[in-house]
Amino acid sequence: MNFKSLSIMTIGAIALSATVSAKELRLSHQWSTKDVRHKFAQIVADHVASAKVDLNIKIFPSKSLFKPKEQYKPLTRGQLDMTVFPLSYAGGQQPAYNLTLMPGLVKNHDHAARMNYSPFMEEIQKIMATDDVMVVVHGYLAGGFAGKDKCITGPNDVKGLQTRAAGKAFETMLVGAGASIASMPSSAIYNAMQTGVLQAANTSSSSFVSYRIYEQVKCYTPAGKTALWFMYQPLLMNKSVFESLNKNQQEALMAGAKKAEAYYLAEAKKEDQASVNVFKKNGVEIKEMSADEFNAWRSIAKETSYKKFVSGYKDGQRLLDLALSVN
């Protein structure tokens, strides 16, 4: 074999080795590519790709890999590497996660950002670690109320109304305020209001717009200076998979995560304001929730949702107190 042939073989072997060593991570989520949750995941993927550390993140949007509520178990088993996931979906496996969709625990987006780096969230992450799961990007999204015939700002406003809530804890609180509950996905709110089945609804800011609820309601209470509905929807990763990456890959991933987290917070705030603009444009009255109304809701939540959570989970009171202690 001559020197030229040997050189070609050596170069080929090096190229093949580089190809083999490039690791691909699979990231799953339930939303379209236009959604903010896809966009922040894409920021992480793009940053990792540009770092040239032999690591690629392939995103599977729109429920194309797993059904939304079925992503947590595959993540814990290493069958899925990463997911943008509303953590309360896994509240059946880990009851503590239900605190990440609990009425009145988060007041606004800046409060949510403090919650992300609080002793409360540290405890939640310790529980995740027992399932071999870790957080890559923190983030909460907010929501509000809409009323077919009147504004829904305080507890008295829902008395006697057929209401849709986003999450079991919110349903429990609304029943405590005197509402009747009609359980349905947010995609069904429009028709339910149109046919008179529903008089009030609670969902995320983005869902209010994407499902055109502004065509069916008289008044909208958005997430403003105070809001009742916040849902923790982080980017999670299998912990063992992260630890299997080399130092450069880990650093690139977390640098991308830092950029994505800042974007996610800014866009979450923009979504709330964008929903206000759309409802206003369509002639819907806008009425924000006052601090006193927020406190009135929280008082009812303490006697309903919080009490139910604590009674069903032995470590519930300690974790609830930690969450309530975040200023």
Spell out what each predicted region is.
Residues 1-8:
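Bacterial N-terminal signal peptides that target proteins for export
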Residues 12, 23-111, 120-327:
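N-terminal secretory/targeting leader peptides
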Residues 9-17:
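Bacterial N-terminal signal peptides
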Residues 1, 22-23:
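Absolute protein N-terminus
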